């Protein structure tokens, strides 16, 4: 099975993630920022990954460090779990949530790149960008997020995690042969 366990400890945070890419969509553990626990649960549910997390940090100062470090650890866990398997590689999904409409396009490429198209600047200064940047850089995927419409930040961010879960869940599915003109990704 495609599993990994990664942990990171700094003076500001401690994050440990156990990831099973061939799971059922469960998110277990204690995450001290309830809103992000909600978003991470949706991510796992739609990706059909099992994730167990142990996390603590200086959230009384600001949750920035913990959200960013969670992205870093989750990205490393994904890379570790997927890198020795053959996977579909590409996927794109469009997800509505009420007035919000978000598209996520992924390539498990070995080349980290994050593009967030947000013409109205709705996500400027939001912690979701820190999570995504940490995840993308450490999982070595290419990710495009397009905010097609929306005004409610909760709806937009939840649609992002649902679209990302659906797209990455599909792109990481095992297949007989890896599609790459180079013959390999990593």
UniProtKB/Swiss-Prot annotation:
EC number: 4.2.1.19
Main location class: cytoplasm
HAMAP family assigned: HisB
Name of the protein described by the UniProt record: Imidazoleglycerol-phosphate dehydratase
Organism: Dictyoglomus turgidum (strain DSM 6724 / Z-1310)
Localisation: Cytoplasm
Keyword entries, A-Z: Amino-acid biosynthesis, Cytoplasm, Histidine biosynthesis, Lyase
Family affiliation: Belongs to the imidazoleglycerol-phosphate dehydratase family.
Pathway of action: Amino-acid biosynthesis; L-histidine biosynthesis; L-histidine from 5-phospho-alpha-D-ribose 1-diphosphate: step 6/9
PROSITE patterns, per the entry: IGP_DEHYDRATASE_2
Record's keyword annotation contains Ubl conjugation: no
């Amino acid at each position: 099975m495609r599993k990994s366990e990664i942990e990171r400890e700094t003076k500001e945070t401690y994050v440990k993630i156990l990831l099973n890419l061939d799971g059922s969509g469960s998110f277990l553990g204690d995450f001290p920022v309830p809103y992000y626990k909600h978003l991470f649960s949706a991510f796992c549910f739609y990706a059909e990954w099992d994730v167990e997390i142990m996390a603590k940090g200086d959230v009384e100062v600001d949750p920035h460090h913990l959200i960013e470090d969670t992205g870093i650890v989750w990205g490393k866990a994904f890379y570790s779990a997927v890198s020795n398997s053959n996977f579909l590689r590409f996927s794109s999904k469009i997800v509505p949530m009420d007035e919000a409409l978000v598209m996520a396009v992924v390539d498990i490429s070995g080349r980290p790149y994050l593009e967030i198209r947000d013409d109205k600047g709705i996500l400027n200064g939001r912690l979701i960008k820190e999570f995504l940047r940490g995840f993308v850089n450490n999982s070595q995927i290419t990710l495009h997020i397009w905010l097609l419409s929306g005004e409610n930040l909760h709806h937009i961010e939840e649609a992002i995690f649902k679209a990302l879960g659906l797209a990455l869940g599909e792109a990481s599915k095992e297949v007989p042969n890896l599609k790459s003109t180079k013959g390999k990704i990593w």
